[in-house]
From Swiss-Prot:
This is Gallinacin-13. The gene is GAL13. It is found in: Secreted; Cytoplasmic granule. InterPro entries: Defensin_beta-like. GO terms for cellular component: extracellular space. It comes from Gallus gallus (Chicken).
Length: 89
């Protein structure tokens, strides 16, 4: 009888050990890649995957500026400006 109890305990322990056999969870992988699990990413973050089995997003700080406008950041000269000139030719 004691052997059956011991075998039952071993089987239960083995059944509960399947999570580490699958590898890291997606939340742990997100943290390892310098990300944060959030419901929505902030405007300076990019979506880099999922967390909590797809319920949350893995957000990482992006190096790109998401709201930059190239027209206002670069000065255009008359040669680069594609708009027609108002002066006569």
């Amino acid at each position: 009888m004691r052997i059956l109890q011991l075998l039952f305990a071993i089987v239960v322990i083995l059944l509960l050990q399947d999570a580490p056999a699958r590898g890291f969870s997606d939340s742990q992988l997100c943290r390892n890649n310098h990300g944060h699990c959030r419901r929505l990413c902030f405007h300076m973050e990019s979506w880099a995957g999922s967390c909590m089995n797809g319920r949350l997003r893995c957000c990482r700080f992006s190096t790109k500026q998401p709201f930059s406008n190239p027209k206002h950041s670069v000065l255009h000269t008359a040669e680069q400006d594609p708009s027609p000139s108002l002066g006569g030719t």
